[in-house]
Swiss-Prot record:
Pathway: Amino-acid biosynthesis; D-alanine biosynthesis; D-alanine from L-alanine: step 1/1. This is Alanine racemase. It holds the Pfam family Ala_racemase_N. It comes from Photobacterium profundum (strain SS9). The keyword Membrane does not apply. SUPFAM superfamilies: Alanine racemase C-terminal domain-like, PLP-binding barrel. GO terms for cellular component: cytosol. It catalyses: L-alanine = D-alanine. GO terms for biological process: D-alanine biosynthetic process. The gene is alr. Keywords: Isomerase, Pyridoxal phosphate. Substrate binds at residues 129, 304. The modification N6-(pyridoxal phosphate)lysine is found at residue 34. One of its GO terms (molecular function) is alanine racemase activity.
């Protein structure tokens, strides 16, 4: 009997990448594998994506792990380098870098490098998190063009703040701003991440940057914009096993704090997974779990190693039966909505105690 196991379906990953190529047929694809491949395993994911043209990471350590693992395709450091001491490592390992600040520009201008850095200039088009402001752009571009440490031509990118909100007018404003600012630029451009690829086709430029959708999880909350609706398949299925099936009488409480009281005589299943495995302790009563092909509600507080579900009075489930926490048959987005979080958080927060099995 297995405890918490995350099954990673690499065929689904390949399928999803091909669907994204169909969605944006004129764009090259930078597969975002930051945060340990969104919790799916950095190297395993990268090596399962022969159709990706490049990879995106957040930390230089992630890029070096890919290089040490034999990945030779371009790797982009999406947050850029953190200090001047990173620059020799970046150019030695052929890691492309975002530049989003004057401090980074000054570090490039003063560095003594053996090779040039490939730079993606990030423009703040309205999210106001990272990026040079539009009024700074001309000066920054001129200085980067004049810098011997920077490979030419420059590349350009920005990031959406509200692309998952189809009612927002911010995304169209960002698209128009970016297209206007980069008009006439010789370098390649990238604007669309997952939501942009799926809902804002005008943002599909020379490069797209799929993240969460690549793993078969939708960035949207609307049912008609589920991953399945986009013909995407879940890559991760998180499972565990029933380790006990108990008779609980009407009026009896279950678990820490007694936050669930049975309204009838029923059977409660105990599943070997908890917040020690990364399953959120904040999951409330009623959070769905899939047991033997049917949805059953969580009943009681998630503990470190276990959680409990109401199997129903006529349940035939037995010890050893599999429970699916999310994945095939139970989308992570649905679970996240019940918990009050986002699916990104679910898949990236599993702990080392969860066995990763690649299919």
């Amino acid at each position: 009997m297995k405890a918490a196991t995350a099954y990673i379906n690499t065929d689904a990953l390949t399928h999803n990448i091909r669907q994204l190529h169909l969605q944006a047929p004129n764009s090259k694809l930078l597969a975002v594998v930051k945060a340990n491949g969104y919790g799916h395993g950095l190297l395993h994911v990268a090596k399962s994506l022969p159709d990706a043209d490049a990879f995106g990471v957040a930390r230089i350590e992630e890029a070096l792990t890919l290089r040490a693992g034999g990945v030779v395709k371009p790797i982009l450091l999406l947050e850029g380098f953190y200090g001047a001491s990173d620059l020799p490592v970046i150019v030695t390992n052929n890691i492309h870098t975002v530049v989003h600040s004057i401090e980074q520009l000054e570090a490039l201008e003063s560095a003594e490098l053996d090779n040039q850095a490939v730079v993606w200039l990030k423009i703040d088009t309205g999210m106001h998190r990272l990026g040079v402001r539009p009024e700074q752009l001309d000066d920054v571009v001129q200085r980067l063009h004049a810098c011997d440490n920077v490979a030419k031509p420059l590349r350009y990118m920005s990031h959406f703040g509200c692309a998952d909100d189809l009612a927002s007018n911010v995304t169209n404003q960002q698209i128009n701003t970016f297209l206007s600012l980069t008009e006439g630029c010789r370098g390649e451009r990238s604007l669309a991440a997952s939501a942009g690829i799926l809902a804002w086709p005008d943002s599909q430029l020379e490069w797209i940057r799929p993240g969460i959708i690549m793993y078969g999880v939708s960035p949207f909350t609307e049912p008609d914009r589920s991953a399945e609706a986009f013909n995407m398949q879940p890559v991760m299925t998180l499972t565990s096993s029933l380790i006990a099936v108990r008779d609980v009488k009407e009026g009896e409480q279950v678990g820490y704090g007694g936050i669930w009281t049975s309204e009838r005589d029923t059977k409660v299943g105990v599943i070997a997974i908890g917040y020690g495995d990364g399953y959120p302790r904040t999951a409330p009563n009623g959070t769905p779990v899939l047991v033997n092909g049917r949805i059953v509600p969580m009943a009681g507080r998630v503990s470190m190693d276990m959680l409990t579900v109401d199997l129903g009075p006529n349940a035939q489930d037995k010890v050893g039966d599999e429970a699916i926490l999310w994945g095939n048959g139970l989308p992570a987005e649905v679970v996240a909505e019940h918990i009050g979080t986002i699916a990104y958080e679910l898949v990236t927060k599993l702990t080392s105690r969860v066995d990763m099995t690649y299919l």
